[in-house]
Amino acid sequence: MLVTRRWESHPANSPDLILQFFGNEFHGYGDDMPETLRRLTELLGYEKEEDGAGMNAAKKIAAELNRRKDDIPAFRRLRCLELDQLNEFLFSTKLNPPIGDQVHHDMHAPLSHYFIHTSLNSYFTGNVFGKYSILPIIEALEQGVRVVELDLWPDGRGSICVRPSWNFEKPLKLQECLDSIKEHAFTKCTYPLIITFKDGLKPELQSKATQMIQQTFNHMVYHHDPHSLEVFPSPQQLRNKILISRRPPKELLYANDDDGKVGVRNGVEIRQHPADPNYQSLVSFHVVEPRGMLQNVLTGKANKIQRPGWYETDIISFTQKRFLRTRPQRKLLIYAPYKPQRAWMHGAQLIALSRKEEKEKLWLMQGMFRANGGCGYVKKPDFLLNAGPSGVFYPTVNPVVVKILKVKIYMGDGWIVDFKKRIGRLSKPDLYVRISIAGVPHDENIMKTTVKNNEWTPTWGEEFTFPLTYPDLALISFEVYDYEVSTADAFCGQTCLPVSELIEGIRAVPLYDERGKACSSTMLLTRFKWS
């Protein structure tokens, strides 16, 4: 439901009163006030106190800045703060971010209790027809990815190369991939890195791969019986460790294609050659991959979820102790549409997604793993880890709204710096914001602001209300577009954030480009409020 507040004068508030308050708290004169701060005071001046804005919001802003002054190096030595510092604080995505940047989840639980940032086709520079390189692997590791995937094949000269089963480009050498992984594995964080090998190697080449892995990583490789029923160690216990995973051998349990039940399929050969014992001993991390109806449900291919069955309830019990990996289904060489939130709400830990395709799904993946300081491990909500009074959590039965999130878009800035070459060539842009919630089906929603014509620094002052049944699984996305009459609207930045980590109050929300690279200046000044 879209709620747009009209600007109404209110006896207790006015832009002049708030401007005067800021002038008393921070040195400076109204004539010297930065334009962006002046626009905000105008918006606050016409808001009612019961909305949590107006003078109340101004006082909270002043109190927070004064409280944090000594923590900001640029402000620490200043005797008194001026309006310029207030403006810098409010509109800085680093000083006034929407979510925290520190690891704060409990990292001592078993590894199966976490969603893990997973990549698909980690060495692809583009789609399946693109070139292969170590640079995408390095980029992924520097952005907090904790699972990388390598396809191992004979190179025809007695050694091992990295390429898909089909090969359109020059393959990579396994050793250069291993060296790059070792160098960058723990630059973003020190929690364990999982390397998944999909191989078509004969035993003699598996033995050679074992030697290369051991010589490269040495004591960093964690050894654990993948078939052990013991609880897997925690991320904290596995810091600076490398875990080796392999596509499941035929003896491993996985979902049957026909009826979606868990069973043992001995009739299908997943590997063509027996594994070298030393190579197999490196594998410490086995993952189940769903098939058939279960895969359709977890990847969002099913049109609707039917009554609770194994694939909706028992799968959540299964993922409390064991690992489940999902990936988009491929038709020929193109991946089918994919909904990662469907897999998350069933407890699947490893949701593999190509970083070069399906940009909207990539944004969701990046948003999920901005949680917990961006370390690549996000602890599952308690309702996915423990059976409640009515049994195992089932996400589409009897939803009850537990929280209401109110989001107010005040204004935005920075497009003239980051997007001037793409928009506004003939006139100033006509910008609007698309706000959406991704999560369990009952929580998903899409809303839009009005279009602000001919503005590089648009001011909206519009509020939106989102009732949420499972906020711990919800992601909020902001997408900005330049409205066009006769052509597709031009992309002007996006971000996705975990709802559970939003900091209440007026925050500077940073925007990113289509591949998730941070824009240098573009941001949205937004207020988050829970009720």
Curated annotation (Swiss-Prot):
Using the record's annotation, list all stretches that form the PI-PLC Y-box domain: 267-385
Q: Does the keyword Lipid metabolism apply?
A: yes
GO biological process per UniProt: intracellular signal transduction; lipid catabolic process
The superkingdom listed in its UniProt entry is Eukaryota
Localization, per the record, is: Cell membrane
Carries keyword Membrane? yes
Q: Name one GO cellular component term.
A: plasma membrane
InterPro entries under this entry?
Answer: C2_dom, C2_domain_sf, PI-PLC_fam, PLC-like_Pdiesterase_TIM-brl, PLipase_C_PInositol-sp_X_dom, PLipase_C_Pinositol-sp_Y
Entry function:
The production of the second messenger molecules diacylglycerol (DAG) and inositol 1,4,5-trisphosphate (IP3) is mediated by activated phosphatidylinositol-specific phospholipase C enzymes.
In terms of SMART domains, this protein maps to:
C2, PLCXc, PLCYc
User: What does the record say about tissue specificity?
Assistant: Expressed in leaves, roots, flowers and siliques.
- Name recorded for this polypeptide: Phosphoinositide phospholipase C 8
Q: What class of enzyme is it?
A: hydrolase
Any one Gene Ontology MF annotation carried by this entry is:
phosphatidylinositol-4,5-bisphosphate phospholipase C activity
What's its membrane topology? Peripheral membrane protein
Q: Which UniProt keywords apply?
A: Cell membrane, Hydrolase, Lipid degradation, Lipid metabolism, Membrane, Transducer
What organism is recorded for this protein? Arabidopsis thaliana
Q: Report the cofactors.
A: Ca(2+)
Residue ranges annotated for the C2 domain, each copy included = 389-513
Query: What residue stretches are annotated with the PI-PLC X-box domain?
Result: 105-247
Listed under catalytic activity are:
a 1,2-diacyl-sn-glycero-3-phospho-(1D-myo-inositol-4,5-bisphosphate) + H2O = 1D-myo-inositol 1,4,5-trisphosphate + a 1,2-diacyl-sn-glycerol + H(+)
Q: What gene is this protein a product of? A: PLC8
Supply the EC number(s): 3.1.4.11
The record, for Pfam families, names: C2, PI-PLC-X, PI-PLC-Y
